[in-house]
Amino acid sequence: LGDVYKRQVNNSYEAKFHYPRTLSKDDYDRLGGDVGFVGMWEKERCDSILYLANHGIKVRIFGNKQWQKYKNYSPNLQIEDHGLHSEDYSKSLKAFKISLCFLRKMNFDQQTTRSVEIPACGGFMMAERTKEHQAMFEENKEAIFFSSNEELLEKCKYYLEHEKERKKIAEAGLKRCQTSDYSNEGMIKNVLNSIFQTIK
């Protein structure tokens, strides 16, 4: 019969798992920091993180074994010996003052699961600038975007010094996730509604 309906959908988050936790001092100590990234090593994201560390930004990484070769690279770079899963993953996205969102270059990604998981968990997201990211979140109001290491550094410096602005943007990003139905349930609901409208 062929395809009767096609629609591209964005990444989504699980509302019962990705939501803002109340964090203790221990949570912030174990899982937080100035700038953080949770994820696998890739050359491009590694280059960006090393650029930040080389210019005085403290970055903490939870990831796979390939990050370990940089463990003693810089006093500004804290490489943990494990990734994060379960509740600690969601907590960390909020515990960092700035949570970085990198895209897989080999996949030509325009967005990733962290594009919605970070703001859904109440985190302040700094992500690579793409058309899809800009469609999902209003730039400088619901998320912060960058297109170069120089811009990334400039914005990290600025927002580390402006806590009120960080919190306002994080709150707006969370609200956008909720009101735009970026959850798994919301995404399925919107797809089904679109299908029903098409076949009427």
Where would I find each of the regions flagged by the language model?
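Short, small-residue-biased leader/transition segments that mark boundaries at the very start
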Residues: 1-5
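Residues at the C-termini of beta-strands that transition into short coil/loop
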Residues: 9-13, 39, 63-65, 129, ...
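Catalytic binding pocket for nucleotide-activated donors in carbohydrate/polymer assembly enzymes
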Residues: 8, 73-200
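Conserved catalytic-core segment of nucleotide-activated headgroup transferases in glycan assembly
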Residues: 14-95
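A structural signal for short, well-ordered beta-strand segments and their strand-loop junctions
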Residues: 7-10, 58-63, 101
